[in-house]
Amino acid sequence: MKPLTARQQEVFELIKAKIEDTGMPPTRAEIARELGFRSANAAEEHLKALARKQAIEIIPGASRGIRILLQDPVEPEDLGLPLIGQVAAGEPILAQEHVESHYQVDPSMFKPQADFLLRVNGESMKNIGIMDGDLLAVHKTQDVHDGQVVVARVDDDVTVKRLERKGSMVFLHAENEEFAPIQVDLTSQHLSIEGIAVGVIRSTTWM
């Protein structure tokens, strides 16, 4: 049996809690509401994943047709660091559907501690040794300072760049002269910081 992801663990624990409290499992709509999913369909996808991992059984034709099979799932911290792949617009970067896999890397080997890995796409940061295909170790925080290499989301596009702020303007600088800075006007554009880069794992040696 495959271990559960952190998000699957949340769904599993909610199902267990509802059964213990009310004697009945939750509906898809209740799961979506409790865990902040956009729709009951999103909850259904997580239930299907749990069923594939034999943590639950889905009983067709019943809104509360969920039966617990697994009593002691593997804890998510035993999985290692999650590797984030493509990030969908509007979804949290650590949403379960963005997790490609997990890597057995000790988060404490990075300072500050890494929370996830992000697969690097492109050569915009190659001058500081962040290469296409590398796994970037990221500490999840919004407490950032000018000059730090950050993982930023600009209007739902995720990028790795060096941060500079000037009033209402933010400049995201590449470490490659072939790439111009990304300019973000905070009065009209949305910018969110997902974390800071704390290390790199070279894909050719790790994968």
Curated annotation (Swiss-Prot):
<dbReference type="InterPro" id="IPR006200">
    <property type="entry name" value="LexA"/>
</dbReference>
<dbReference type="GO" id="GO:0045892">
    <property type="term" value="P:negative regulation of DNA-templated transcription"/>
</dbReference>
<keyword id="KW-0227">DNA damage</keyword>
<dbReference type="InterPro" id="IPR050077">
    <property type="entry name" value="LexA_repressor"/>
</dbReference>
<dbReference type="Pfam" id="PF01726">
    <property type="entry name" value="LexA_DNA_bind"/>
</dbReference>
<keyword id="KW-0235">DNA replication</keyword>
<dbReference type="InterPro" id="IPR006197">
    <property type="entry name" value="Peptidase_S24_LexA"/>
</dbReference>
<keyword id="KW-0068">Autocatalytic cleavage</keyword>
<dbReference type="GO" id="GO:0006508">
    <property type="term" value="P:proteolysis"/>
</dbReference>
<feature type="active site" description="For autocatalytic cleavage activity">
    <location>
        <position position="161"/>
    </location>
</feature>
<dbReference type="GO" id="GO:0006281">
    <property type="term" value="P:DNA repair"/>
</dbReference>
<feature type="active site" description="For autocatalytic cleavage activity">
    <location>
        <position position="124"/>
    </location>
</feature>
<dbReference type="InterPro" id="IPR039418">
    <property type="entry name" value="LexA-like"/>
</dbReference>
<dbReference type="GO" id="GO:0003677">
    <property type="term" value="F:DNA binding"/>
</dbReference>
<dbReference type="Pfam" id="PF00717">
    <property type="entry name" value="Peptidase_S24"/>
</dbReference>
<feature type="site" description="Cleavage; by autolysis">
    <location>
        <begin position="89"/>
        <end position="90"/>
    </location>
</feature>
<dbReference type="InterPro" id="IPR036286">
    <property type="entry name" value="LexA/Signal_pep-like_sf"/>
</dbReference>
<keyword id="KW-0238">DNA-binding</keyword>
<keyword id="KW-0678">Repressor</keyword>
<keyword id="KW-0378">Hydrolase</keyword>
<comment type="subunit">
    <text>Homodimer.</text>
</comment>
<dbReference type="InterPro" id="IPR006199">
    <property type="entry name" value="LexA_DNA-bd_dom"/>
</dbReference>
<keyword id="KW-0234">DNA repair</keyword>
<dbReference type="GO" id="GO:0009432">
    <property type="term" value="P:SOS response"/>
</dbReference>
<protein>
    <recommendedName>
        <fullName>LexA repressor</fullName>
        <ecNumber>3.4.21.88</ecNumber>
    </recommendedName>
</protein>
<dbReference type="InterPro" id="IPR036390">
    <property type="entry name" value="WH_DNA-bd_sf"/>
</dbReference>
<dbReference type="GO" id="GO:0006260">
    <property type="term" value="P:DNA replication"/>
</dbReference>
<keyword id="KW-0804">Transcription</keyword>
<dbReference type="GO" id="GO:0004252">
    <property type="term" value="F:serine-type endopeptidase activity"/>
</dbReference>
<dbReference type="InterPro" id="IPR036388">
    <property type="entry name" value="WH-like_DNA-bd_sf"/>
</dbReference>
<comment type="similarity">
    <text>Belongs to the peptidase S24 family.</text>
</comment>
<keyword id="KW-0805">Transcription regulation</keyword>
<dbReference type="InterPro" id="IPR015927">
    <property type="entry name" value="Peptidase_S24_S26A/B/C"/>
</dbReference>
<comment type="function">
    <text>Represses a number of genes involved in the response to DNA damage (SOS response), including recA and lexA. In the presence of single-stranded DNA, RecA interacts with LexA causing an autocatalytic cleavage which disrupts the DNA-binding part of LexA, leading to derepression of the SOS regulon and eventually DNA repair.</text>
</comment>
<keyword id="KW-0742">SOS response</keyword>
<feature type="DNA-binding region" description="H-T-H motif">
    <location>
        <begin position="28"/>
        <end position="48"/>
    </location>
</feature>
